[in-house]
Amino acid sequence: MDKFRVQGPTTLQGEVTISGAKNAALPILFAALLAEEPVEIQNVPKLKDVDTSMKLLSQLGAKVERNGSVHIDASQVNVFCAPYDLVKTMRASIWALGPLVARFGQGQVSLPGGCTIGARPVDLHITGLEQLGATIKLEEGYVKASVEGRLKGAHIVMDKVSVGATVTIMCAATLAEGTTIIENAAREPEIVDTANFLVTLGAKIAGQGTDRITIEGVERLGSGVYRVLPDRIETGTFLVAAAISRGKILCRNAQPDTLDAVLAKLRDAGADIEVGEDWISLDMHGKRPKAVNVRTAPHPAFPTDMQAQFTLLNLVAEGTGFITETVFENRFMHVPELSRMGARAEIESNTVICHGIETLSGAQVMATDLRASASLVLAGCIAEGTTIVDRIYHIDRGYERIEDKLRALGANIERVKGE
C-alpha cells in the first residue's frame, strides 16, 4: 500500500486550482443512466471513486469515454445489476438503483462499502423508492427494486436529512408519473448541482437548495452538457492548510458561496479572507491561528467533511477549542493519530476538546477515512521532522493529486509506493 512521507515544518503559500466536486460528480454520473441520449459532463475530478463509477456504468451497458470531459451514452444499457466486486469499495453505487428502476422498471445493487464512519444505512433510499411505488427485496446481499409500468409521484417526508437518499428519490422521481414533493430534503450544493444537471436534460425540478424539492415527472430525458461545481471540501482543506502553516493561498476555480460557514470560522481564527466570483484568498500574515468552536450539522451549517481539518487547526491554535460532531458517530478516529504527533485532545461523547500547542512532532500515523487522512497529511506539513502517513488509498478516493498540489505550495511530500 502506498504511503506519504512528509518533511516539516513548511509554510504553505501559493496558488491551487480546485477540482470538480466528488460529491456532485458521483450522483451526476449515475443520474446519466436516466438519459436516453448521450451526455457530456465537464470538470469531473480524476479520482478512484469516479473510475469505479465509470467502470460500473460500462458494466451496465453504457458507453463511457473520458477525454477531458466524461461522455456517457446510456441508450444501450441492458444489464440492471451492480455487482459486489465493484460496489464493495464505494457507497455511491447505491445511486444506480433509482435511475435503473425509474427508467427500466428494475435494478439491483449489492449492499455498499466505502468509508467506515458510523451507521450510514440505505434504509432511507429504500423507503423513498417504495413510496414511489417500487417493490424492494433484500436478497443474497443485494437490494432488488422493481416496478410494473412507471413509478408514481408521491409526497415524501424524510425521517432525517440525508444527502444520499435525497439524490436517490429526486433522480427516480424525474421519470415518475405525476408530481413528487420531498420534504426535509437535504440542501447541500451537490444536491443543487445534481438537480441542475437533470434540468439540463429536460427534468422539471424546483426548490433544490431548500428543504422542499418538487419534481414533476417527465416521459424521458435527453442529451446535454453540464459542468460539475468546484469541490468545496477540497477548497476548505487547502484554506486550512494555509491557515495552520501561517501562510497565504489563492484558490482558483472555487465557489465561495458554498463555503459560508467554513469561511466564517476561518475569519474567527484570525485569517484575512477575500473572495471573488470564482476565487478565495486567505492570508495569515505569519500569525498563529486562534482556536474556534465548531458544531457540524447539515448544510448550510458547518460541514462534517471539514471537521477533521478544523480539529487539526484547533490543536495548533492559540487557546482551547471545542469541536462537536452531530452528523456521524465514530468520526474522531484521526484524534488518537494526531495525539501520536504530540497533540493534546480529549474526546467526551461527540465532542473533542482541543488544547492548542505551538508545534507538532513528526510520527508514523495511519489514515482511517477520507477527511481524517487529509488532516494527517496537513499535520505532517507543519510538524517538526518526518511524518509517514499509511493507508493513503483513502485520500485517493477524494482528493485529486493532493501531493502535487501541496508540493506547488511548498510542501516537502512524496508518495512512497507500497509492496
UniProtKB/Swiss-Prot annotation:
Gene Ontology CC: one annotated term: cytoplasm
Keywords linked to the UniProt accession: Cell cycle, Cell division, Cell shape, Cell wall biogenesis/degradation, Cytoplasm, Peptidoglycan synthesis, Pyruvate, Transferase
Cysteines joined through disulfide linkages: none
Residues modified as 2-(S-cysteinyl)pyruvic acid O-phosphothioketal: 115
Chief location bin: cytoplasm
Residues the record marks as active site: 115 (proton donor)
Matches recorded under InterPro entries: Enolpyruvate_Tfrase_dom, Enolpyruvate_Tfrase_sf, MurA_subfamily, RNA3'P_cycl/enolpyr_Trfase_a/b, UDP_GlcNAc_COvinyl_MurA
Residues engaged in binding phosphoenolpyruvate: 22-23
Pathway info: Cell wall biogenesis; peptidoglycan biosynthesis
Gene3D superfamilies on file: Enolpyruvate transferase domain
Family: Belongs to the EPSP synthase family. MurA subfamily.
Protein's name according to its UniProt entry: UDP-N-acetylglucosamine 1-carboxyvinyltransferase
Organism: Salmonella gallinarum (strain 287/91 / NCTC 13346)
Upper taxonomic lineage: Bacteria, Pseudomonadati, Pseudomonadota, Gammaproteobacteria, Enterobacterales
